[in-house]
Amino acid sequence: MDTQSSAKLAEMTYEIGKTKVKKRIPNAIDNVNEHLENEGINYEVVPEWTDRNISTFRNKDDPSKIHISHKGTQFGSSTGSKDVISDLKIALGLGNYDTHVRRRKKRTERIINALNPDELTMSGHSLGGMSLNHTIGKSKKVREKLLQADTFNAGSSFAFNNDLKLSERAKKELKEIPITHHRTRNDIVSKGL
């Protein structure tokens, strides 16, 4: 998947994430699908595996191609307070121990179990980039399926150690997967990277 499409799918998670009332998620999904079609991105939302934290997309021509995107911090959303608490933990170097981040990992694994993609790509912005990194680093199930991942200004702490404690096997597996960390110069959230 090209970087622009990956970034657009990460951006679209915010459209779904901003819904404060759960029953309005289908309207947000319709808006996202329309936007993706207008942008010429051949993916659509998988409603049953999309919530306010993680959006799942499938290729319209080949449903075995799946893209999972983790949402970043979104003030004013129903997840906003959890997002901010996670951000504070990231700033203190404790992001990998955050419940919100760990739940995203478990949900991602459930999505993979349910959809069993032939091709899996992933993306995330800010907090979503950090939770994506955690998920990839800590989940063998994800690494076994993952073809590519892009993070955009992934959350990190410039004051504390951000390293994931990875097994030697995980480190070896990660060398085989193209994971690109895109960072905007002077972005304070990702400064630790």
Regions found by a protein language model. Give the residues of each.
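Extracytoplasmic/secreted cell-surface and envelope-processing proteins
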Residues: 131-132, 158-161, 191
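A catalytic-pocket lid/entrance helix-loop region that shapes and gates access to the active site
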Residues: 168-178
